[in-house]
């Protein structure tokens, strides 16, 4: 599978986020006493979000360059949601990581609000995979 490291990074980030956010949620019934598990969850969420921003910008820039240089029709859906740009196993793995991240975010958002930033991580990695390895259709040439 092409881009195995990208898929691996997506799942590792999602797993670390899930572990820390679920620990923060388990600790949340008494919100005004010791909030120890909240701090690692907050650090992980902010670190994943901060790391995802340059990745998303890279994916967008690389996709724009592919459009400009190769005359490929790189779309936002194809770039970030792998619509018709990735083989099914890759799409399943990367979008599965995004779905898992969204579920954890929904379950833990009340206890760990910084977690709502984390789904940008697997989404940015979808973009990086598509920008590097995705296949896009050619831009149709106008008839003369």
Give names to the regions the model predicted.
Residues 1, 5, 32-43, 85-93, ...:
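Juxtamembrane loop-transmembrane helix junctions in multi-pass integral membrane proteins
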Residues 116-144:
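Alpha-helical transmembrane segments and their immediate juxtamembrane interface regions
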Residues 96-108, 121-124:
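Hydrophobic, membrane-inserted alpha-helices
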Residues 19-47, 74, 105-120:
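Membrane interfacial helix motifs at helix-loop boundaries and amphipathic/re-entrant anchors
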Residues 1-19, 133-144:
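Cytosolic-side membrane-entry/anchor segment at the start of a transmembrane helix
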Residues 11-25, 97-103:
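Canonical alpha-helical transmembrane segments of integral membrane proteins
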Residues 73-100:
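Short membrane-interface loop/juxtamembrane segments of multi-pass integral membrane proteins
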Residues 54-76:
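Membrane-water interface of transmembrane alpha-helices
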